[in-house]
């Protein structure tokens, strides 16, 4: 073994790249260690044979966190890692997005990237180490790849400015959590959430990260110079263009294709383009000496691509007739589902989201078992994309990677505007059902989520809206598009999603398919996005401008109270018997914290209030000079014990029964009898002294 090791400084951290010691049968393998904090093993394997029948580049990225990395044993019956967690799925997507555009066009060999977290101190997120390792493993693998890439996480504090690769603790106090990846020349991917930062601050963070991760790219190049395998014998040049075929299609069908792209209804447009494609295939393939049907279809697609892009950069109307800055018509409704806690139907052109907010108790929070330990998440946002939303039949089942990713983006967009847990201690679940889709369904989910939460009475700090921007760049000409359609996303060069309030940005996601995106283009895109966001917020505010002052009648009632910590065991009871009895009898749920904070949730106000009274009864202290209605529990020779509060009995001495002389207590009282008693005293041992004979005088004096 002759391992090759490269060390470099990355911000405050020392990063070590090592290859040649572990996983030597992979095409490329790198162990990335950041200080003594995180170690990630990244392997890349490329199939030697192409699979052109797939019709897409078969790249798969698998990020996995092993529990042994944090010195833990997995839970569950089998005691081993199972299906990928949401965090693992999202990180896999984060790594996939910047590397996918850097493989050559037409490359159809399967490539699999596996990133395994093998050691962590749980202080920082291992995702940046995994991205650096992926860049390095690809660079030394010999697989055709136009890298390397660098990656960095950026935080922001008003007082100290931008911070490179923050710890979890530093992120908690930050106004920004942004991951940026790209090549030496260009930014390729941005994923972020923020607390209402300005567009300039967001752009500054992107440029800061790009400058900082140049050290990563330099180190990877140095590693590759020493340890890279021979580059595959792959023809990087694209297949020779079928000039004659393209010319024939354009000559005979070019005008018809151009006209088809003026049909504004997506289904009608697709139907017309399908007819034209069939006509082209029938006319130009099938006979001996003619191109194959697949070649003709590919050429037809190229004509479509060029037609749409040429129209846009030359200033012609877009597919649906809009100019570059106009948002599609909006239709907004709230309270559309009578039995839900909050609901909204948000329609933008041919994209529609039915969004529902549900409030639950603290026990409904999602339990997350992470490398950092178990924690509860009181906010969930789930995004569903059924096949009928695009007029197709398809698989129904659990959420895929795309749905998980879109749901997380929508969650990031609204999370900063949610109230603090001590102000609004409900668990919140938002579900976005995409019922129609023609571009930017994730941003429709953001708008719908904000509306549904306000409809449910969740005290949002401010309404949130989102917009998707696109880009078409041909040479020096470019056009930034507001509110892109599905076709514009597919045929364009950039997907740029921005969400925020009227005050600032709360989420930014960017994926770029080409090189040469300049600071100027990003600045224009952010400016147009702000203009569109304010337009959408204005229309949303006309329907519901602030959260409802009362929760839905269908939502659970929550009562918060606090008791002395010494009383917690009294409320819980032996083996939980007391609290269990209260919950069963009142149909409410009770959560008690170690500091004595209690949250009572009831399906109705009456249930919650009944439980509160029971808790008050258990925790209340007898007040000297107060009259109580009590029940005689036990009679003794010298008096009677009367229960005045749950678990609290006081003694009425025989001399305190009546002004007249009493021979026997049973002459006055019997067990089970209800009587009014006055609290005379409570000694330092908690013993309560009661009187019956002084009740009348106390009442007369106004007690």
UniProtKB/Swiss-Prot annotation:
What gene does the UniProt entry assign to this protein? pnp
Broad class of where this protein is predominantly found: cytoplasm
Needed cofactors: Mg(2+)
Q: Which residue range or ranges hold the KH domain?
A: 556-615
Which chemical reaction does it catalyze?
RNA(n+1) + phosphate = RNA(n) + a ribonucleoside 5'-diphosphate
Q: Does the keyword Manganese apply?
A: no
Going by the UniProt record, its keywords in alphabetical order are: Cytoplasm, Magnesium, Metal-binding, Nucleotidyltransferase, RNA-binding, Transferase
SUPFAM superfamilies in the cross-refs:
Eukaryotic type KH-domain (KH-domain type I) (SSF54791), Nucleic acid-binding proteins (SSF50249), Ribonuclease PH domain 2-like (SSF55666), Ribosomal protein S5 domain 2-like (SSF54211)
InterPro entries membership: ExoRNase_PH_dom1 (IPR001247), ExoRNase_PH_dom2 (IPR015847), ExoRNase_PH_dom2_sf (IPR036345), KH_dom (IPR004087), KH_dom_type_1 (IPR004088), KH_dom_type_1_sf (IPR036612), NA-bd_OB-fold (IPR012340), PNPase (IPR012162)
Instruction: Tell me the protein's name.
Output: Polyribonucleotide nucleotidyltransferase
Question: What's a Pfam family this protein contains?
Answer: PNPase
The Gene Ontology biological process annotation of the record reads: mRNA catabolic process; RNA processing
In this chain, Mg(2+) is annotated as bound at 489, 495
Lineage of producing organism: Bacteria, Pseudomonadati, Pseudomonadota, Gammaproteobacteria, Pseudomonadales
Q: Where is the S1 motif domain?
A: 625-693
Spell out the family assignment given in the record's similarity comment.
Belongs to the polyribonucleotide nucleotidyltransferase family.
Q: How does it assemble?
A: Component of the RNA degradosome, which is a multiprotein complex involved in RNA processing and mRNA degradation.
């Amino acid at each position: 073994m002759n391992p090759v090791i490269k060390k470099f400084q990355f911000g405050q951290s020392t990063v070590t790249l090592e290859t040649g010691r572990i996983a030597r049968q992979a095409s490329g393998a790198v162990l990335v260690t950041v200080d003594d904090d995180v170690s990630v093993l990244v392997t890349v394997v490329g199939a030697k044979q192409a699979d052109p029948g797939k019709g897409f580049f078969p790249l798969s990225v698998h990020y996995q966190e092993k529990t042994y990395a944090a010195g833990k044993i997995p839970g569950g019956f089998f005691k081993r890692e199972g299906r990928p967690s949401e965090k693992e799925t999202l990180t896999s997507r984060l790594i996939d997005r910047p590397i996918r555009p850097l493989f050559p066009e037409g490359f159809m060999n399967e490539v699999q990237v596996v990133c395994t977290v093998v050691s962590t101190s749980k202080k920082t997120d291992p995702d940046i180490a995994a991205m650096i390792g992926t860049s390095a493993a690809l660079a030394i693998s010999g697989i055709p790849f136009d890298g390397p890439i660098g990656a960095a996480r950026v935080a922001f504090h008003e007082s100290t400015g931008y911070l490179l690769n923050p710890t979890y603790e530093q992120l908690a106090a930050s106004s920004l959590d942004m991951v940026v990846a790209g090549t030496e020349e260009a930014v390729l991917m941005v994923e972020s959430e923020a607390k209402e930062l300005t567009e300039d601050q967001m752009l500054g963070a992107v440029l800061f990260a790009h400058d900082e991760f140049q050290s990563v790219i330099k180190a990877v190049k140095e590693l590759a110079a020493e340890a890279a395998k021979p580059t595959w014998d792959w023809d990087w040049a694209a297949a020779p263009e079928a000039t004659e075929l393209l010319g024939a299609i354009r000559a005979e069908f070019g005008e018809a294709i151009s006209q088809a792209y003026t049909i504004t209804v997506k289904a009608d447009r697709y139907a017309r383009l399908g007819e034209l494609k069939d006509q082209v295939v029938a006319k130009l393939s099938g006979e001996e000496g003619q191109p194959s049907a697949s070649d003709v279809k590919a050429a037809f697609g190229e004509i479509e691509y060029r037609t749409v892009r040429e129209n846009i950069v030359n200033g012609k109307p877009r597919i649906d007739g809009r100019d570059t800055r106009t948002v599609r018509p909006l239709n907004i409704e709230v309270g559309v589902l009578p039995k839900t806690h909050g609901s909204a139907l948000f329609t933008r052109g041919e994209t529609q989201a039915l969004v529902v907010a549900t409030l639950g108790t603290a026990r409904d929070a999602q339990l997350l078992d992470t490398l950092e330990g178990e924690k509860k998440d009181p906010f969930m946002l789930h995004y569903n994309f059924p096949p009928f939303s695009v007029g197709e039949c398809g698989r129904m089942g659990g959420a895929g990677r795309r749905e998980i990713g879109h749901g997380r983006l929508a969650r990031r967009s609204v999370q900063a505007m949610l109230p603090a847990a001590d102000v609004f201690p409900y668990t919140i679940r938002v579900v976005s059902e995409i019922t129609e889709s023609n571009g930017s369904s994730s941003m429709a989910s953001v708008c719908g989520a904000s509306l549904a939460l306000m409809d449910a009475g969740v005290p949002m700090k401010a309404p949130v809206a989102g917009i998707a921007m696109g880009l078409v760049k041909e040479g020096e000409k470019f056009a930034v598009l507001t509110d892109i359609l599905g076709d514009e996303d597919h045929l364009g060069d950039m997907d740029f999603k921005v969400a925020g309030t009227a005050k600032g940005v709360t989420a930014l996601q960017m994926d770029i398919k080409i090189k040469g995106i300049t600071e100027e283009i990003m600045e224009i895109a952010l400016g147009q996005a702000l203009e569109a966001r304010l337009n959408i917020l204005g229309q949303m505010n006309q329907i519901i401008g602030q959260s409802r002052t009362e929760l839905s009648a269908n939502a659970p009632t929550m009562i918060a109270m606090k008791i002395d910590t010494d009383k917690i065991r009294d409320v819980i009871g032996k083996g939980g018997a007391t609290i269990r009895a209260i919950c069963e009898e009142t149909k409410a749920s009770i959560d008690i914290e170690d500091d004595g904070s209690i949250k009572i949730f009831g399906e109705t106000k009456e249930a919650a209030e009944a439980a509160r009274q029971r808790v008050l009864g258990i925790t209340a202290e007898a007040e000297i000079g107060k009259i109580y209605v009590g029940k005689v529990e036990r009679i003794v020779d010298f008096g009677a014990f009367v229960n005045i509060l749950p678990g609290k009995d006081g003694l009425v001495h025989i001399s305190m029964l009546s002004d007249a002389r009493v021979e026997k207590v049973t002459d006055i009282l019997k067990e089970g009898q209800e009587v009014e008693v006055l609290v005379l005293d409570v000694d330092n041992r908690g013993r309560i002294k009661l009187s019956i004979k002084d009740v009348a005088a106390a009442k007369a004096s106004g007690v």
